[in-house]
């Protein structure tokens, strides 16, 4: 939680199992030190490859907040029901064909992020593009690609897993893998 005007870090909440205590300690220290939420991306935190990634979830939260501070356009769960279905916007799902076939939001066209550059001509210029993926990473990458081609693109905050869990009252407590990819 951060103050909108100053980005001063005010609080944090984490849900999970392993490593939650470490990350809350880091965030509590950052709050005590008066860090801005955008400073979290620059923290140099120790890690061991078998237990964490090179960029800790605390760093990733900082990157997300930094993107917001720089004007990354997002859309949220409460916007989903209000998205125009009249063709005035493009609705894009960047997950794999397999992920899309297991469930998707009506009206969303499936172009996997790895095919986006080759299939960019399938997206009508001049229309805003609302993008979703499984967890948020691929849709973020897709919005950056689309912006590079001159599109006005909006990234869904949360991903289809979040959307599906809320809309269909499903539990999110399960083993998750990166970007919905099976290991």
Mark where each language-model region is.
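C-terminal catalytic lobe of FAD-dependent flavoproteins
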Residues: 1-40
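Short hydrophobic-acidic sequence motifs that mark active-site Asp/Glu residues
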Residues: 9-11, 91, 110
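Rhodanese-like catalytic fold shared by cysteine-dependent sulfurtransferases
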Residues: 38-89, 97-128, 134-183
């Amino acid at each position: 939680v951060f103050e909108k005007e100053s980005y001063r870090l005010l609080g944090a909440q984490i849900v999970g199992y392993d490593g939650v205590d470490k990350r809350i300690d880091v965030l509590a220290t950052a709050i005590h030190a008066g860090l801005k939420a955008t400073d979290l991306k620059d923290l140099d935190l120790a890690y061991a490859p078998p237990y964490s990634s090179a960029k800790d979830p605390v760093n990733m939260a900082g990157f997300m907040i930094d993107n917001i501070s720089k004007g990354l356009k997002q859309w949220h769960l409460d916007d989903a029901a209000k998205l125009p279905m009249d063709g005035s916007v493009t609705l894009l799902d960047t997950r794999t064909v397999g992920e899309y076939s297991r469930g998707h939001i009506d009206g969303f066209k499936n172009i996997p992020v790895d095919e986006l550059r080759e299939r960019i001509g399938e997206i009508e210029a001049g229309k805003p593009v609302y993008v979703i993926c499984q967890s948020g990473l691929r849709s973020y990458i897709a919005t950056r690609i689309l912006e590079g081609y001159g599109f006005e693109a909006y990234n869904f905050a949360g991903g289809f897993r979040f959307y599906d869990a809320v809309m269909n009252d499903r539990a999110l407590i399960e083993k998750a893998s990166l970007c919905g990819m099976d290991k």
